[in-house]
From Swiss-Prot:
<dbReference type="InterPro" id="IPR003728">
    <property type="entry name" value="Ribosome_maturation_RimP"/>
</dbReference>
<keyword id="KW-0963">Cytoplasm</keyword>
<dbReference type="Pfam" id="PF02576">
    <property type="entry name" value="RimP_N"/>
</dbReference>
<keyword id="KW-0690">Ribosome biogenesis</keyword>
<dbReference type="Pfam" id="PF17384">
    <property type="entry name" value="DUF150_C"/>
</dbReference>
<dbReference type="InterPro" id="IPR028989">
    <property type="entry name" value="RimP_N"/>
</dbReference>
<comment type="function">
    <text>Required for maturation of 30S ribosomal subunits.</text>
</comment>
<comment type="similarity">
    <text>Belongs to the RimP family.</text>
</comment>
<dbReference type="GO" id="GO:0005829">
    <property type="term" value="C:cytosol"/>
</dbReference>
<dbReference type="GO" id="GO:0006412">
    <property type="term" value="P:translation"/>
</dbReference>
<dbReference type="InterPro" id="IPR035956">
    <property type="entry name" value="RimP_N_sf"/>
</dbReference>
<dbReference type="InterPro" id="IPR036847">
    <property type="entry name" value="RimP_C_sf"/>
</dbReference>
<dbReference type="InterPro" id="IPR028998">
    <property type="entry name" value="RimP_C"/>
</dbReference>
<protein>
    <recommendedName>
        <fullName>Ribosome maturation factor RimP</fullName>
    </recommendedName>
</protein>
<dbReference type="GO" id="GO:0000028">
    <property type="term" value="P:ribosomal small subunit assembly"/>
</dbReference>
Amino acid sequence: MDSQGPIILEKSIKIEEVIKIANTSIIDIVTKTVTPEIKAPYELVDVEYDKMGSDYILSILVDKEGGITVEDTSDLTNIISPLLDTIDPDPFPNQYMLEVSSPGLERPLKTADSLKAAVGSYINVSLYQAIDKVKVFQGDLLAFDGETLTIDYLDKTRHKIVNIPYQAVAKVRMAVKL
């Protein structure tokens, strides 16, 4: 029997891709941990984990009907911070700063329900692959049936309608119409 040792498959992965994969895992763990504890009237909008300069920032974006106050963010920080300390094993490779805040005017739309609620709103949609040579659309969300977003957007001076398959969407957020 011929023994050649282990087979090593080489794949070139950029460090940015490795960091993105690790950050996705951290985001998933944090989301699963904090979601059950963020109760009505609050809604968890998004969890982000990014490096800014030499610091790591864990941002938890929360909203409620009528908007979130500074007191709300303080109360939520007091709930969330101890929860993060209970995660075992600790998913954070470095110390981080916790930031609990409002998602702001350009809030991300992460779920099908948030897209359905946004029908009639002005949005920004980034795609994995271009449709008709366009990778980012910004316009009014006319409809969303769970599978397709219908957007009225301005192409130079003409209004156009585009139907975008939901699985083609990389990122969606509210946008400010100027």
